[in-house]
Amino acid sequence: MSSSPDLPKTHLALVLTSTSAPPEVKTIPTPQPGPGSVVVRMLISNIISYSRDIYDGTRKYPFPTPLVIGTSGIGRLAATGPDAVLLKPGQLVFVDSFIRGRDDPSAAFLFGVHEGYTEGSKKLMRGGGKMQLMPNTPKSQ
């Protein structure tokens, strides 16, 4: 059963629209959990030491824009998809930025960093397998 107690309509996110401009804090729609997914309210996330080189284009990592910036971290489940059996809102979880396709292990990417090199990984990062981290920010309505 899908569960989304007090899930805000919007949340704040650090969004990169171009490597020629700095990222901006924007209000964006909060994702709703579908089958096989959850929404995580992030408590803490690491910052990669070479982040500036990624997001200013120095490293030439392929990624779609606009890009919600974020990597691995720890958070609490804010909502669960309709098929969740063990996961419950409020549970503490670790979010790994390394994402693999459920039906194709070669379709892999680093969330918020690199879309990978296969068509499958690009499809996942560009929306076929949406992932967006919801920061621990005050609720927006």
Predicted regions and their residues:
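Glycine-centered loop/turn positions within well-structured domains
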Residues: A21, Y50, V85
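Short glycine/threonine/proline-enriched tight-turn/helix- or strand-capping micro-motif at secondary-structure
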Residues: A21-P29
